[in-house]
A protein has these predicted regions:
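A short glycine-rich, His/Asp/Glu-containing loop-to-beta-strand
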Residues: 36-41
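Charged, amphipathic alpha-helical segments and their flanking helix caps
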Residues: 1-33, 45-144
Length: 144
């Protein structure tokens, strides 16, 4: 199991989404976007969990977010709502399809998605945010 392997596997899984057709999958929270739709993911939090006499397990939350640039056209804004929903379902499906991320974690859980409008550099984006919790048993070894 490796943390870098888990992130690499997430990248591979998210890159296979074809509907909606993302122009990029980014492993970082973006500061600006040159084109959309874009799918980004980043490490959000880490919590120590269960502990034994010899090791500690953890849960790391990866935030996955889809970005769709809003336009003045009502028709385009309406189509973005469907694309948001499709993105939420596809991210959920891809990540649940490989719960141990090709052997790089013990288990994982896809959380509840939320939708919001985000201002980034004066441009408005409609976003879908999906938390993804990765559990790694025995991540830290305790030396007596």
């Amino acid at each position: 199991m490796s943390r870098s392997g888990a992130l690499d596997r997430i990248d591979v899984l998210l890159s296979t989404i074809t509907d909606p057709a993302f122009v990029a999958v980014i492993r970082a929270e973006p500061l600006a976007l040159s084109g959309t739709p874009v799918l980004a993911y980043w490490v959000q939090a880490r919590t120590n969990g269960w502990q034994t006499l010899s090791d500690i397990g953890s849960t790391t939350t990866i935030m996955v977010r889809a970005y769709f640039r809003l336009q003045a056209s009502a028709d385009i804004r309406e189509s973005i709502e469907l694309e948001l929903w499709d993105a939420m379902v596809e991210v959920d499906t891809k990540l649940r399809g490989d719960a141990n991320l090709d052997g790089n974690c013990t288990d994982s859980t896809v959380g509840s998605a939320t939708v919001a409008t985000l201002d980034m550099g004066g441009a408005l984006y409609r976003t879908a945010t999906i938390p993804f919790d990765i559990q790694i048993y025995e991540e830290i070894t305790i030396t007596p």
